[in-house]
Amino acid sequence: MGAPSPDQDIAAIRRNYQRASLRSVDLEADPVEQFRRWLQQAIAADLQESTAMVLSTFDGKRPSSRTVLLKAFDKRGFVFFTNYGSRKAEDISAHPNVSLLFPWYDLERQVAIMGPAERISRAESQAYFSSRPFGSRLGVWVSQQSQVISSRQILEMKWQEMNRRFANGEVPLPEFWGGFRVAPTEFEFWQGRENRLNDRFRYRPQQDSNHAQTWRIERLAP
């Protein structure tokens, strides 16, 4: 018999999830606070890129996904930054509903967040842009994100040009760059469990008897 095919090798790859459990009594009533707790645990575990999230958008015909970095969050939503001429920004302009996925594999857990995205204020974008290192601010001016280029040399030449242009270290925030905030309408917290009997809890908004917004929590079958 010959060696197993690559597909057979892949099919045999599996692990049994046993690190933790997630019970309804463990959950915060507010999903933002539940997310905060899990994010703090991911950071404390020294996970690589613990603030990385997979952003999925839709252009009207097909979805697309990419990894971006979470830069702020509160009860209003979850913030990331990008070029406003990028594919993701164009998708959001036409179809604002997106999803975010935080895949914390080493903790055998993930968080999915769904909701519409919209641009944040220029003042908020300016505050974050000013906090970035010089090279990161310069890079924003260098790259026309998602545009076809003939070679890497184009980027390197543009870098030198921008480096000369902003040699004094003062790099302004360009009009074509800034943040988006995703306002959550649904959360799902997933914790891997033994024998694939994983724990899943979904949060959806509801109104209480005083017409204040609260969150309905439901356990989902794995």
From Swiss-Prot:
Note describing how the cofactor binds: Binds 1 FMN per subunit.
Biological or metabolic pathway of the protein: Cofactor metabolism; pyridoxal 5'-phosphate salvage; pyridoxal 5'-phosphate from pyridoxamine 5'-phosphate: step 1/1; Cofactor metabolism; pyridoxal 5'-phosphate salvage; pyridoxal 5'-phosphate from pyridoxine 5'-phosphate: step 1/1
Entry keyword Flavoprotein: yes
Cofactor: FMN
Substrates-to-products reaction catalysed: pyridoxamine 5'-phosphate + O2 + H2O = pyridoxal 5'-phosphate + H2O2 + NH4(+); pyridoxine 5'-phosphate + O2 = pyridoxal 5'-phosphate + H2O2
Enzyme kind, highest EC tier: oxidoreductase
Coiled-coil parts of chain: none
Pfam families for the chain: PNP_phzG_C, PNPOx_N
Ligand binding (substrate): R14, R15, N16, Y17, K71, Y128, R132, S136, R196, L197, N198
Assigned protein family: Belongs to the pyridoxamine 5'-phosphate oxidase family.
Function as written in the Swiss-Prot or TrEMBL entry: Catalyzes the oxidation of either pyridoxine 5'-phosphate (PNP) or pyridoxamine 5'-phosphate (PMP) into pyridoxal 5'-phosphate (PLP).
PANTHER family: PYRIDOXINE-5'-PHOSPHATE OXIDASE (PTHR10851:SF0), PYRIDOXINE-5-PHOSPHATE OXIDASE (PTHR10851)
Protein name according to UniProt: Pyridoxine/pyridoxamine 5'-phosphate oxidase
Origin organism lineage: Bacteria, Bacillati, Cyanobacteriota, Cyanophyceae, Synechococcales
